[in-house]
UniProtKB/Swiss-Prot annotation:
Modified residues (Phosphoserine): 365, 377
Topology Extracellular: residue spans: 1-68, 132-142, 208-230, 307-314
Lipidation (S-palmitoyl cysteine): 353
GO molecular function annotation: beta-endorphin receptor activity; G protein-coupled receptor activity; G-protein alpha-subunit binding; G-protein beta-subunit binding; morphine receptor activity; neuropeptide binding; voltage-gated calcium channel activity
Residues that bear Phosphothreonine: 372, 396
Cell compartments where the protein resides: Cell membrane; Cell projection, Axon; Perikaryon; Cell projection, Dendrite
Name of protein: Mu-type opioid receptor
Origin superkingdom: Eukaryota
Family: Belongs to the G-protein coupled receptor 1 family.
Alphabetized CDD domains for the sequence: 7tmA_Mu_opioid_R (cd15090)
This protein's encoding gene: OPRM1
Amino acid sequence: MDSSAVPANASNCTDPLAPSTCSPAPGPGSWVNLSHLDGNLSDPCGPNRTDLGGSDSPCPPTGSPSMITAITIMALYSIVCVVGLFGNFLVMYVIVRYTKMKTATNIYIFNLALADALATSTLPFQSVNYLMGTWPFGTILCKIVISIDYYNMFTSIFTLCTMSVDRYIAVCHPVKALDFRTPRNAKIVNVCNWIISSAIGLPVMFMATTKYRQGSIDCTLTFSHPTWYWENLLKICVFIFAFIMPVLIITVCYGLMILRLKSVRMLSGSKEKDRNLRRITRMVLVVVAVFIVCWTPIHIYVIIKALVTIPETTFQTVSWHFCIALGYTNSCLNPVLYAFLDENFKRCFREFCIPTPSAIEQQNSARIRQNTRDHPSTANTVDRTNHQLENLEAETAPLP
């Protein structure tokens, strides 16, 4: 997300009193879109920079490990992109493919996987952007990439917040959960989360644009005057509504759930149901905890840079990119967590990767049952054909 749109009135990039307006962009997008909360997507000090030399050069000394940083970032982004896209699409596939996976919790997981898949799909653009030190993809893709990052940030945390409330209802109010926790309601809530996220995603899409700066093209956000006010207001709003408030809601929900689980030995009257309930609750808790761990550094970093001037050093640049990479890494971790923490996901992943004869037979029978429901006349024909084949086999079978 373009963290640092360049103010229109910035005139002297050597002015020590205004370093935030001239500091080099953090790479693939400071909040890039992670980077868009603190910088544009283009890094004038990237590996292909033009070092003007002298005190007025916006780049650090030539000896800085920009090429090593670029290679490391591209390698990390490539891994996150491949694992994230494959893993999240696999999660969505098994939820759509297997009827037993269409539970309320898994519908929320589908929404989370969709947001993560969209976010990881932007990484190739960001890698090229950082390597070239300019944004070569045009204004339309600039708008799409930046808005996807904001959509992912808000939709992911809203979905995790919804999952925590859903777990709270399942554990603390099991009777009410029977009416509320349905796949249909979960789909409606998912749509609402995307609509609410549009409150920030759509404005950001209109604000995103490309600008020429120092011989390169930046993919950045533009703000009205005074620029510093609207830019910092955006950062603070994102920090509050996409991090602080959801984390507080999640903390309260899990605090109440822990008290409930400690005070009651059996929640549903069945040991098996209780075991599944606790297992799912534990899985959601781990997913939420990993999300908070991965996203806390970038949120803290951005809010500090909005309030305090941080000198541009190699350590600052490396730590900034580490925070960005950590945020994107979360998008590829969730499928791994599901595979280790949920037996149903683990079984479905195994059947997808290594199909067994029994699994293939189950899939074929499921297709036949679906065709039976959709085409009754065809189903009757299939039944007659099967009956004729059975008679033929009986007639041609060797005598004992």
